[in-house]
Swiss-Prot record:
Belongs to the class-II aminoacyl-tRNA synthetase family. Keywords: Aminoacyl-tRNA synthetase, ATP-binding, Cytoplasm, Ligase, Nucleotide-binding, Protein biosynthesis. Homodimer. GO terms for cellular component: cytoplasm. This is Histidine--tRNA ligase. One of its GO terms (molecular function) is ATP binding. Its EC number is 6.1.1.21. The gene is hisS. It catalyses: tRNA(His) + L-histidine + ATP = L-histidyl-tRNA(His) + AMP + diphosphate + H(+). It is found in: Cytoplasm. CDD domains: HisRS-like_core (cd00773). The keyword Repeat does not apply.
Length: 414
């Protein structure tokens, strides 16, 4: 029997409904902040991700799904969303002054060839938000504020921690890297980190194998310029004044090379294991690196698989919330098919949800089916109802019933 590829999932019935509810709620939150949706292709040129994410990252060096098309062009399935959005902004000239600040979001499948495990898949879904054209501290605040609002709106406050850092740039970055290299030279590093040490030493701090041994990492804070330090302090003060509790982490660098300035990760503590659920920050140089356009930018990404797993653990009310329909009709005789269809069409015409048993079931089985759908009203139609155009509407909430006619039913609906 043919089966789905390893690291992928099928979504159906209650699981698909839960995903739909989560995505709808996320879009409602982003609409409150005036973000609009953007959709980009499922695959892009390989060069886009090499230039944006960085050639030394695990994503580019190990995890991309690559293929060559019939014109010998190197393409990849999207491993993340930001680079695609930046490409779209440049190609479609969305950086025009009248569009700024440009605030967009996407919910899209991504693809990475990594070992499948709990909450991590080779095809996964990501919510991302991106803001272009604003270098304001208030914009950094808004991005993290949206992330915390998502956590709060889904009632996931338990075991949540927010970590922040400020990545230095320019000459000070070079000085810090020299100090970091000196510090790391005393450790026995994994093979990947030995490569990173030469190409991008900051990435060593993001290693899942070696990071536990780095206890006294040189602090980036000691190398920030006065301007950078002031900006970071003002950002943290804004969080403090609005009761957003954050923890500074010198080892936080993010797994993508394009980040500069303020960065953050929101982590969930699960059985003494911290899982990142939302992460992002500022990447002011990325648009310039891809399209030679100076445009400030910031944003975040959130893996929906892991997020929904946490919802299942903490928010049972959303998981167990039944999707009600307004009317369920049970047609037990072919003579009542026309009447049944008239009732359904009229109900749906005014925006109500209605369904029926379109195949022959015993009355007992049909009533069981109705119970699963949790309708407000149930109508049973047989040959007598078809002849008289009279039928009984059962109110499932108030446990009452009334007899009515098709004419009166139409009038009551209107």
């Amino acid at each position: 029997m043919l089966q789905k590829p390893r690291g992928t999932q099928d979504f159906f019935l209650d699981e698909a409904k839960l995903w739909n509810k989560v995505e709808t709620k996320l879009k409602e939150i982003l609409d409150q902040f005036n973000y609009s949706e953007i959709r980009t292709p499922m695959f892009e040129s390989k060069e886009l991700f090499i230039r944006s994410i960085g050639s030394t990252t695990d994503i580019v060096s190990k995890e991309m799904y690559e293929f060559v098309d019939k014109k010998n062009r190197s393409l990849v399935l999207k491993p993340e969303g930001t680079a695609s959005v930046v490409r779209a902004v440049i190609e479609n000239k969305l950086y025009a002054e009248e569009n700024l600040p440009l605030k967009v979001y996407y919910i899209s499948p991504m693809f990475r060839y990594e070992r499948p495990q709990n909450g991590r898949y080779r095809q996964f879904h990501q919510l991302g938000i991106e803001v272009f054209g604003s270098d304001s501290i208030q914009q950094d605040y808004e991005v993290l504020n949206i992330a915390t609002k998502i956590i709060n709106q889904f009632k996931l406050n338990k075991n949540i921690k927010i970590y922040t850092n400020f990545l230095i740039t320019g000459k000070n970055r070079e000085d810090y890297i020299l100090e970091l290299k000196k510090y790391l030279s005393d450790f026995k590093l994994c093979n990947d980190c030995n490569t990173r040490l030469e190409k991008n030493p900051l990435r060593v701090l993001d290693c899942k194998i070696d990071d536990k041994q780095f206890k006294n990492v040189p602090s980036m804070q000691d190398f920030l310029t006065k301007e950078q330090k002031t900006r970071y302090d003002q950002t943290l003060e804004l969080f403090k004044k609005t009761n957003i509790s954050v923890i500074h982490d010198d080892k936080l660098v993010r797994g993508l090379d394009y980040y500069t300035g303020f960065i953050f990760e929101i982590k969930y503590l699960n059985n003494n294991n911290e899982q990142t659920i939302i992460a992002g920050g500022r990447y002011n140089n990325l648009v310039n690196e891809i399209g030679n356009i100076n445009l400030a930018a910031c944003g975040f990404g959130m893996g929906l698989e892991r997020f929904i797993n946490i919802i299942k653990e903490q928010n049972s009310s959303l998981v167990n919330q039944k999707t009600n329909i307004d009317l369920y009709t049970i047609c037990i005789d072919d003579l009542a098919i026309e009447l049944n269809q008239q009732i359904l069409d009229l109900t749906r015409s005014i925006g109500l949800k209605a369904d029926s048993n379109y195949y022959h079931l015993s009355l007992k089985s049909a009533l069981k089916k109705a119970d699963k759908l949790n309708p407000k009203y149930v109508i049973i139609l047989g040959s007598n109802e078809a002849k008289t155009n009279e039928f009984i509407i059962k109110d499932q909430i108030n446990k009452t019933q009334i007899k009515t006619t098709l004419t009166k039913f139409i009038k009551d609906l209107k």
